[in-house]
Design a protein with these regions (language model features):
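Short, conserved loop/helix-junction motifs that constitute active-site signature segments
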Residues: 110-114, 141-143
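Alpha/beta-hydrolase-fold enzymes
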Residues: 1-77
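Short beta-strand/loop motif that positions the catalytic acidic residue
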Residues: 113, 119-121
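Short alpha-helix in the alpha/beta-hydrolase fold that links the catalytic acid
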Residues: 102-107, 129-140
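Long, compositionally biased charged/polar accessory segments in the mid-to-C-terminal portions
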Residues: 83-85, 89-90
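Active-site nucleophile elbow and catalytic-triad environment of alpha/beta-hydrolase enzymes
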Residues: 73-74, 90-109
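Acidic catalytic loop of the alpha/beta-hydrolase fold
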Residues: 77, 96-97, 123-128
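Catalytic active-site module of serine/aspartate enzymes centered on a nucleophile-bearing elbow/loop
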Residues: 134-184
Length: 184
């Protein structure tokens, strides 16, 4: 995704304020990223190999498939509400972040934390797999922390938490209620 922004001539080394923004690069970065936000099953159900506005292949370079049109739409929406440099810094910060690095282990990183935790994962999330969530839960429990964990069976991928997901809402509401009862 970052390379798409870097290769946009309007990026200008990040100094595009006051000029044309690198909308093509940012839109393409969003399109690339968006593919990982949905599960394979949801992508297949929603789009499959269906064509957008035709019954037969056009054998050209236009956006023929529904998935192409959807991804273009997502890219256009994104550039209207997000800044390319912000995208670059956020994604780079995610790459650099390693909680274990400064502490030697996850358990050591959580040792001094006094808060209770609620960890929720989704079976179809490719970006934050359930196994990573379970690793965090094991580390929290290893250092005696109170942690609730729920793995939600879902076919909607990383975006599940953005959708109308009653199970996620219920888990968060119950956790917050318990925290209010505990702490007032």
């Amino acid at each position: 995704g970052r390379q798409a922004i870097f290769r946009d001539p309007s990026w200008n080394g990040g100094d595009y304020y006051g000029g044309k923004k690198p909308e093509d690069g940012l839109g393409l970065a969003r399109m690339i990223g968006h593919i990982t936000y949905m599960s394979e099953r949801l992508m297949h159900e929603k789009f499959g190999r269906r064509l957008q506005n035709a019954d037969l292949f056009g054998f050209n370079f236009e956006s023929e498939f529904m998935v192409e049109s959807y991804l273009h739409h997502q890219g256009i929406k994104f550039v209207n509400r997000f800044d390319a440099n912000s995208y670059l810094y956020i994604t780079k910060a995610i790459d650099y972040f390693d909680l274990k690095a400064d502490y030697g282990s996850l358990a050591a990183a959580f040792e001094k934390v006094t808060a209770d935790f609620l960890i929720i994962s989704y079976t179809s999330d490719w970006l934050y797999p359930s196994e990573q969530a379970r690793e965090i839960v094991r580390a929290l429990r290893a250092c005696g922390k109170h942690v609730g964990y729920t793995e939600i069976e879902s076919d909607t991928g990383h975006d599940t938490f953005l959708l109308d997901d009653r199970q996620t809402q219920r888990n968060i509401a119950n956790f917050l209620r318990s925290q209010f009862e505990k702490h007032g």
